[in-house]
Amino acid sequence: MPFTLGQRWISDTESELGLGAVVAVDARTVTLLFPSTGENRLYARSDSPVTRVMFNPGDTITSHDGWQMQVEEVKEENGLLTYIGTRLDTEESGVALREVFLDSKLVFSKPQDRLFAGQIDRMDRFALRYRARKYSSEQFRMPYSGLRGQRTSLIPHQLNIAHDVGRRHAPRVLLADEVGLGKTIEAGMILHQQLLSGAAERVLIIVPETLQHQWLVEMLRRFNLRFALFDDERYAEAQHDAYNPFDTEQLVICSLDFARRSKQRLEHLCEAEWDLLVVDEAHHLVWSEDAPSREYQAIEQLAEHVPGVLLLTATPEQLGMESHFARLRLLDPNRFHDFAQFVEEQKNYRPVADAVAMLLAGNKLSNDELNMLGEMIGEQDIEPLLQAANSDSEDAQSARQELVSMLMDRHGTSRVLFRNTRNGVKGFPKRELHTIKLPLPTQYQTAIKVSGIMGARKSAEDRARDMLYPERIYQEFEGDNATWWNFDPRVEWLMGYLTSHRSQKVLVICAKAATALQLEQVLREREGIRAAVFHEGMSIIERDRAAAWFAEEDTGAQVLLCSEIGSEGRNFQFASHMVMFDLPFNPDLLEQRIGRLDRIGQAHDIQIHVPYLEKTAQSVLVRWYHEGLDAFEHTCPTGRTIYDSVYNDLINYLASPDETEGFDDLIKNCREQHEALKAQLEQGRDRLLEIHSNGGEKAQALAESIEEQDDDTNLIAFAMNLFDIIGINQDDRGDNIIVLTPSDHMLVPDFPGLSEDGITITFDREVALAREDAQFITWEHPLIRNGLDLILSGDTGSSTISLLKNKALPVGTLLVELIYVVEAQAPKQLQLNRFLPPTPVRMLLDKNGNNLAAQVEFETFNRQLNAVNRYTGSKLVNAVQQDVHAILQLGEAQIEKSARALIDAARNEADEKLSAELSRLEALRAVNPNIRDDELTAIESNRQQVMESLDQAGWRLDALRLIVVTHQ
């Protein structure tokens, strides 16, 4: 190589050293100084891995003083280059800059600059970059973005609600599904969509204290959302880091009690600029026109400051009209300001519901009914629809559906309230109760007698709680290590049941963690039964491992022993047998226990086994739950109401289970009350609202569409390719399970989402639902999104060289594969990617500028190519540099037409969709006051900003591959 002192070269193997300068040359070696790092390198002259840095007219270069110039002419004298051009800061022309004064921190970011500087990537990285661009663009355009990545079953009514609400600007809605239908999942889906699209960035979730960890686990496990739990301690710590402690985290969970207890804390919450507020158990917020509770006022204050609000609550029928109005008032106080007016409005919706029922029945409509529909919808252009709906044509069904949609759009609260019932949702199992009456051991009888004497001054409530758990009374006198399990007949029954049902997975729930731990030891030591334990003292990771062991079919645990609190938020619908070793104190907790198995998607009827001790509070409670409330075999929406109404009587019977006089009457009264309330709830059902919330055929089609996307084999192939190139080890464990661990040669030292110990993943939704330790990998998973970002935000794979062995072409024939990206810059919340995500345009040009991309598909072509080592590649580039420059100019001339077509199509789509949505809502505003002015304003503003951003869209070269034909 001809070296001259002062020339600038770059290392092919250590490009991070920057621009080097030749400082010494002898017959056999050359020394380069790299000023940006202060390091020297000694190379052999004959075979040095360095590339001469030579810029061309049109390039922008930087001097060591920091100013830039546009190169117009290059002169060479005695082996040294001088660049002549115009300074960009002063616009002075004819400025000369000798190469020795070039900035040494030079970074080659443009693909062509990297290629000419010898920074040649491996061929597989170029292919990965193109695939990443292609798949990333496709995913942004996919319908239902944000709904595919969560670890949940594809349940139509949940997807319907999430799809509707998740796309809105600052949604303010009430989610009031019946228990077990997945309000938490619906809220998580909405959050996931809003965060993924950029519509929201900061989220606050307020829940009862007992549900904080459940929400934390659900958001992380199902949606990969890492929330921070704020309590007094965390709040105090964060005060050292920021004036407003809540500014230290983007996603926060706290309890309602924590929020309302301190005036300053509530002020900090209100000032924290949240985008979305989620309130669980909102029906516990007590309100009346004269005296709203402090809790209600705290949420009301927050709801005034936060644009988006999701309230999760019991069904409107359970709440009562006034309480239901109070929730709606939090969402839109301007719309819901007068309770009497609200009651009157609700009565007026009955004809609308009747009209919808009439359309769905499919019967021919009379002229009077057609006229009534016309008046309700109140639009001039629906006559053809009405005629089609009443005809025998194939269009009749779709016309009826369209009319139903129009009616539902006009339904009073259908935009702010979503409510599904078990009656309206298919897929729930039956529940069968098996009670096992067992004798009360003498040891317990003695302990209870002594406890009664010593605890005479205890309240009835405390005595009732004690009597539910006789083993704890026994341990109070005999010590914590007393071996109650040696004589408790429930333990003997449990061991017998498990040994005779070895093939069944059994969930055992008890009130306390200590009971679960003691039972595990007994089962293991006496019968060798594999039992996992699950309680609140375990970390989330430990609970995951226990749940995963229980989920394993062949070698897993037969039994999972759960404490009351430890099992919150976890579902095990792959099991259908449940044992309640003891009973919870109230019907809500009973339903929560059964709800661990009684979920949509449960394939078998649920067998509920309740071994109970006679003459104890357990025997009282099992009768009251079953005979009084029918709470074991059916969900019990009346449970809390009746529990509150008979609380004192029930407590007395539990505290003194021997005194049974009048107990049969109590059960009879409770059953009558239960039946009456149930009938009242059924009568009050808003069937129109149910149809709207359920989504019908549209929701079913949505679920099926996402299920089809689950089978995308491109994702698996791409992910494996991505992991290989990043340097992530993959260990296939079978059963659709793969363990990923970091290797010693990672592309980056710390890859987000991959811990030192590694992670377990699956691409199969069913496996992910059964095994909570396995992360469900989709295009929306952070691991894939971080991988895409790692590849596309840097220059990985942006320049490479390949050889094409093809005897049909002359040796030395050049082809240049160009990957352009058409894109527009805009704030994330505009969700511009719906219309124009960064979109790759591939061109394959010969030296005459002929574009062969349409005839030569990428993957097929890629398989025909062979890699070139960096040294040989640099030599090839230097030899054909001028030809490549010429082809690049031909490419620049051609890309504009393709890019303009993409941009114009995006503009048309955006204008059409956003204008149509605005027009629809403006038209509905006249007949449905639940459409907020701020929502209309936001859509119009969004449309204008989107169109302006698309007007500014452009394109750039993202990657290139030089291909040289060879016959060898």
Swiss-Prot record:
<dbReference type="Pfam" id="PF00176">
    <property type="entry name" value="SNF2-rel_dom"/>
</dbReference>
<feature type="short sequence motif" description="DEAH box">
    <location>
        <begin position="280"/>
        <end position="283"/>
    </location>
</feature>
<dbReference type="InterPro" id="IPR023949">
    <property type="entry name" value="Helicase_RapA"/>
</dbReference>
<keyword id="KW-0067">ATP-binding</keyword>
<dbReference type="GO" id="GO:0016817">
    <property type="term" value="F:hydrolase activity, acting on acid anhydrides"/>
</dbReference>
<dbReference type="InterPro" id="IPR027417">
    <property type="entry name" value="P-loop_NTPase"/>
</dbReference>
<keyword id="KW-0010">Activator</keyword>
<dbReference type="InterPro" id="IPR022737">
    <property type="entry name" value="RapA_C"/>
</dbReference>
<dbReference type="InterPro" id="IPR049730">
    <property type="entry name" value="SNF2/RAD54-like_C"/>
</dbReference>
<dbReference type="GO" id="GO:0005524">
    <property type="term" value="F:ATP binding"/>
</dbReference>
<dbReference type="InterPro" id="IPR000330">
    <property type="entry name" value="SNF2_N"/>
</dbReference>
<comment type="similarity">
    <text>Belongs to the SNF2/RAD54 helicase family. RapA subfamily.</text>
</comment>
<comment type="function">
    <text>Transcription regulator that activates transcription by stimulating RNA polymerase (RNAP) recycling in case of stress conditions such as supercoiled DNA or high salt concentrations. Probably acts by releasing the RNAP, when it is trapped or immobilized on tightly supercoiled DNA. Does not activate transcription on linear DNA. Probably not involved in DNA repair.</text>
</comment>
<dbReference type="Pfam" id="PF00271">
    <property type="entry name" value="Helicase_C"/>
</dbReference>
<dbReference type="GO" id="GO:0003677">
    <property type="term" value="F:DNA binding"/>
</dbReference>
<keyword id="KW-0805">Transcription regulation</keyword>
<keyword id="KW-0238">DNA-binding</keyword>
<feature type="binding site">
    <location>
        <begin position="177"/>
        <end position="184"/>
    </location>
    <ligand>
        <name>ATP</name>
    </ligand>
</feature>
<comment type="subunit">
    <text>Interacts with the RNAP. Has a higher affinity for the core RNAP than for the holoenzyme. Its ATPase activity is stimulated by binding to RNAP.</text>
</comment>
<keyword id="KW-0804">Transcription</keyword>
<keyword id="KW-0347">Helicase</keyword>
<dbReference type="InterPro" id="IPR040765">
    <property type="entry name" value="Tudor_1_RapA"/>
</dbReference>
<feature type="domain" description="Helicase C-terminal">
    <location>
        <begin position="490"/>
        <end position="662"/>
    </location>
</feature>
<protein>
    <recommendedName>
        <fullName>RNA polymerase-associated protein RapA</fullName>
        <ecNumber>3.6.4.-</ecNumber>
    </recommendedName>
</protein>
<dbReference type="InterPro" id="IPR038718">
    <property type="entry name" value="SNF2-like_sf"/>
</dbReference>
<dbReference type="GO" id="GO:0004386">
    <property type="term" value="F:helicase activity"/>
</dbReference>
<dbReference type="InterPro" id="IPR014001">
    <property type="entry name" value="Helicase_ATP-bd"/>
</dbReference>
<keyword id="KW-0547">Nucleotide-binding</keyword>
<dbReference type="Pfam" id="PF12137">
    <property type="entry name" value="RapA_C"/>
</dbReference>
<feature type="domain" description="Helicase ATP-binding">
    <location>
        <begin position="164"/>
        <end position="334"/>
    </location>
</feature>
<dbReference type="GO" id="GO:0006355">
    <property type="term" value="P:regulation of DNA-templated transcription"/>
</dbReference>
<dbReference type="Pfam" id="PF18337">
    <property type="entry name" value="Tudor_RapA"/>
</dbReference>
<dbReference type="InterPro" id="IPR001650">
    <property type="entry name" value="Helicase_C-like"/>
</dbReference>
<dbReference type="Pfam" id="PF18339">
    <property type="entry name" value="Tudor_1_RapA"/>
</dbReference>
<dbReference type="InterPro" id="IPR040766">
    <property type="entry name" value="Tudor_2_RapA"/>
</dbReference>
<keyword id="KW-0378">Hydrolase</keyword>
